[in-house]
Regions:
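Short helix-initiation/N-cap motifs at beta->coil->alpha
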Residues: 49-54, 133-146
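Glycine-centered hinge/linker elements that transmit conformational signals in sensory
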Residues: 56-58, 103-135, 179
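Hinge/lid segment of periplasmic solute-binding proteins
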Residues: 1-28, 69-70, 84-85, 171-179, ...
Length: 315
């Protein structure tokens, strides 16, 4: 069974050589865009964050001049919560700014590339992104995009099936691509997400529970969820399944995005990860809200993380 799933996910679910959970679905951040608006304005899906900024501003300005005063260029998750950690990690990693804490436990967030990434995002506020994005989670961003009032959106794969639903005003007008690079020297970076299923040691019916886990993580159920809900399978073979690709074409085109997604530093920071993430998203949110400058905020963040880990030596 383990060989049928992405190896990295199986490794993540293995403790002391024993498989303790089963991969259920894999997530990674994606860029959604309005195919019709890009075609109307002679634009292509952006390859860099600068291209996204320029394209979003251009289309937003022209659409507003034509009477759509609710149009915004780009919506995403800017609330001070785990979703902002995911968004900001994508910005930072795409600029070659690292992943907050490296695999050896060294704190790396205070660097020029990371500061550039966060400052770039701060420049979107009240230009191509509404000020309200500072309190957006996934559903707030999707609400604006799916109502037809945004050119671009960063979100997870689940938003695809909803945008394509019978009640959606943008049905058949949505495209999906990899997130932009942080400049010509950068690379596309998508934060890894997803879920696993396990059986509690305190279960009164461990065998029944294990059977349920195997059913829910099996090929039939993963295929159904991929087709009906755009949940990315953890089973490699389903990325070549014609019915899955017909329902969610991006799963084939963006296969490498999911395989090479950037992991949050939860493994190396262990039980302190929640504190690390909390410090990170608050530092980023402060910059986005215009309360601090990126360089100063990241320097303060690095100092806080060093205190938390005794200089990165004790996570």
């Amino acid at each position: 069974i383990e060989k049928e799933h992405f190896p990295a996910l199986v490794q993540n679910d293995t403790l002391d050589g024993k498989l303790v959970a089963m991969p259920w679905f894999i997530d990674a951040g994606l860029l959604y865009y309005r195919k019709d608006l890009l075609a109307k304005h002679g634009a292509q899906p952006p390859k860099t964050w600068r291209e996204l900024t320029e394209t979003a501003q251009k289309i937003q300005d022209v659409e507003r001049a034509a009477g759509n005063d609710k149009m915004w260029g780009f919506v995403w998750q800017g609330r001070a919560y785990e979703g902002l950690t995911c968004n900001a990690l994508e910005w930072v990693a795409s600029h070659n700014g690292g992943s907050i804490v490296d695999a050896r436990g060294k704190i790396t967030i205070d660097n020029p590339q990371a500061a550039t990434a966060i400052a770039t995002a701060a420049g979107w506020i009240d230009t191509i992104s509404p000020e309200g994005v500072l309190n957006y989670a996934e559903e707030e961003a999707r609400g604006v995009f799916q109502s037809g009032n945004a050119v671009f959106m960063r979100n997870w794969p689940y938003a695809w099936s909803l945008a394509q639903g019978p009640e959606s005003v943008i049905k058949d007008r949505v495209g999906v691509s990899a997130l932009p690079k942080g400049g010509t020297d950068g690379h596309s970076a998508a934060t890894l997400g997803g879920s696993q299923l396990a059986v509690s040691n305190y279960s009164k019916h461990p065998q029944l529970a294990a059977d349920l886990v195997l059913y829910l993580t099996g090929a039939q159920e993963q295929k159904r969820r991929a087709i009906q809900g755009a949940y990315n399978p953890t089973l490699i073979a389903l990325y070549q399944d014609p019915e899955v690709l017909a329902a969610a074409p991006f799963m084939g085109a963006l296969y490498d995005t999911f395989v090479n997604a950037v992991a949050r530093p939860s493994t190396v920071t262990g039980i302190k990860y929640n504190q690390v993430s909390n410090e990170f998203w608050n530092a980023v949110h402060s910059v986005l809200a215009g309360k601090t400058q990126a360089q100063a905020s990241l320097a303060q963040l690095e100092s806080a993380l060093k205190r938390l880990s005794r200089g990165g030596r004790h996570w």
